[in-house]
From Swiss-Prot:
Component of the molecular motor that translocates viral genomic DNA in empty capsid during DNA packaging. Forms a tripartite terminase complex together with TRM1 and TRM3 in the host cytoplasm. Once the complex reaches the host nucleus, it interacts with the capsid portal vertex. This portal forms a ring in which genomic DNA is translocated into the capsid. It comes from Human herpesvirus 6A (strain Uganda-1102) (HHV-6 variant A). InterPro entries: Herpes_TT2. Keywords: Host nucleus, Viral genome packaging, Viral release from host cell. This is Tripartite terminase subunit 2. It comes from the Viruses. It is found in: Host nucleus. Associates with TRM1 and TRM3 to form the tripartite terminase complex. GO terms for cellular component: host cell nucleus. Belongs to the herpesviridae TRM2 protein family. Pfam families: Herpes_UL33 (PF03581). GO terms for biological process: viral DNA genome packaging.
Amino acid sequence: MMDSSPEKTNLELLYERVCEQGREFEVVFYPMLPRLYEMMLPSLEARLNFLSVGYRHVAFARYVHGDVDCVHREVMAQKMVLLTSILSKLLNVNGILEHQEYLNTE
Protein backbone atom coordinates (compact mmCIF):
# COMPACT_ATOMS: atom_id res chain seq x y z
CA MET A 1 0.00 0.00 0.00
CA MET A 2 1.31 3.46 -0.93
CA ASP A 3 1.97 6.16 1.66
CA SER A 4 -0.63 8.98 1.77
CA SER A 5 1.55 11.88 2.87
CA PRO A 6 0.10 15.42 2.95
CA GLU A 7 2.71 16.53 0.39
CA LYS A 8 0.92 14.65 -2.39
CA THR A 9 -1.56 16.35 -4.67
CA ASN A 10 -5.23 15.43 -4.84
CA LEU A 11 -4.60 13.79 -8.20
CA GLU A 12 -1.86 11.59 -6.75
CA LEU A 13 -4.09 10.58 -3.83
CA LEU A 14 -6.93 9.73 -6.23
CA TYR A 15 -4.53 7.67 -8.37
CA GLU A 16 -3.45 5.73 -5.29
CA ARG A 17 -7.05 4.94 -4.35
CA VAL A 18 -7.86 3.78 -7.89
CA CYS A 19 -4.73 1.59 -8.03
CA GLU A 20 -5.55 -0.01 -4.68
CA GLN A 21 -8.89 -1.21 -6.07
CA GLY A 22 -7.13 -3.19 -8.80
CA ARG A 23 -9.65 -2.15 -11.45
CA GLU A 24 -8.88 -1.29 -15.07
CA PHE A 25 -10.41 1.71 -16.77
CA GLU A 26 -10.89 2.50 -20.43
CA VAL A 27 -9.31 5.77 -21.55
CA VAL A 28 -11.38 7.85 -23.98
CA PHE A 29 -9.97 10.81 -25.90
CA TYR A 30 -12.54 13.50 -26.58
CA PRO A 31 -12.04 16.14 -29.30
CA MET A 32 -10.27 19.12 -27.74
CA LEU A 33 -10.42 21.58 -30.62
CA PRO A 34 -13.49 23.74 -31.10
CA ARG A 35 -15.69 22.62 -34.00
CA LEU A 36 -14.67 25.73 -35.96
CA TYR A 37 -11.03 24.58 -36.07
CA GLU A 38 -12.05 21.14 -37.30
CA MET A 39 -13.97 22.69 -40.20
CA MET A 40 -11.43 25.41 -40.91
CA LEU A 41 -8.32 23.25 -40.47
CA PRO A 42 -9.23 19.64 -41.35
CA SER A 43 -5.72 18.18 -41.22
CA LEU A 44 -2.99 18.20 -38.62
CA GLU A 45 -0.67 19.79 -41.17
CA ALA A 46 -3.12 22.68 -41.65
CA ARG A 47 -3.29 23.23 -37.87
CA LEU A 48 0.51 23.29 -37.61
CA ASN A 49 0.70 25.73 -40.52
CA PHE A 50 -1.91 27.93 -38.81
CA LEU A 51 0.23 28.00 -35.67
CA SER A 52 3.35 28.84 -37.67
CA VAL A 53 1.61 31.73 -39.42
CA GLY A 54 0.39 32.99 -36.04
CA TYR A 55 3.95 33.08 -34.72
CA ARG A 56 5.12 34.97 -37.80
CA HIS A 57 2.36 37.57 -37.33
CA VAL A 58 3.33 38.03 -33.68
CA ALA A 59 6.97 38.45 -34.65
CA PHE A 60 5.97 41.03 -37.26
CA ALA A 61 3.77 42.92 -34.78
CA ARG A 62 6.61 43.00 -32.25
CA TYR A 63 8.99 44.25 -34.92
CA VAL A 64 6.64 47.01 -36.09
CA HIS A 65 5.25 48.10 -32.72
CA GLY A 66 8.04 47.14 -30.34
CA ASP A 67 7.31 45.63 -26.95
CA VAL A 68 3.89 47.14 -26.43
CA ASP A 69 2.13 45.82 -23.34
CA CYS A 70 -1.54 45.70 -24.35
CA VAL A 71 -4.56 43.44 -23.94
CA HIS A 72 -4.46 42.38 -27.60
CA ARG A 73 -0.96 40.97 -27.22
CA GLU A 74 -1.94 39.11 -24.04
CA VAL A 75 -5.02 37.58 -25.69
CA MET A 76 -2.98 36.51 -28.72
CA ALA A 77 -0.29 35.00 -26.50
CA GLN A 78 -2.89 33.07 -24.46
CA LYS A 79 -4.56 31.73 -27.59
CA MET A 80 -1.22 30.66 -29.04
CA VAL A 81 -0.32 28.85 -25.81
CA LEU A 82 -3.69 27.08 -25.86
CA LEU A 83 -3.40 26.10 -29.52
CA THR A 84 0.19 24.96 -29.01
CA SER A 85 -0.78 22.70 -26.13
CA ILE A 86 -3.73 21.29 -28.08
CA LEU A 87 -1.55 20.57 -31.11
CA SER A 88 1.17 18.95 -29.01
CA LYS A 89 -1.46 16.69 -27.45
CA LEU A 90 -2.76 15.83 -30.92
CA LEU A 91 0.75 14.98 -32.05
CA ASN A 92 1.27 12.79 -28.99
CA VAL A 93 -2.04 10.99 -29.59
CA ASN A 94 -1.22 10.48 -33.27
CA GLY A 95 2.19 9.11 -32.32
CA ILE A 96 0.59 6.68 -29.91
CA LEU A 97 -1.95 5.57 -32.50
CA GLU A 98 0.70 5.11 -35.19
CA HIS A 99 2.83 3.09 -32.77
CA GLN A 100 -0.15 0.91 -31.86
CA GLU A 101 -1.00 0.34 -35.53
CA TYR A 102 2.59 -0.76 -36.05
CA LEU A 103 2.25 -3.22 -33.17
CA ASN A 104 -1.00 -4.65 -34.58
CA THR A 105 0.33 -5.36 -38.08
CA GLU A 106 1.52 -8.88 -37.27
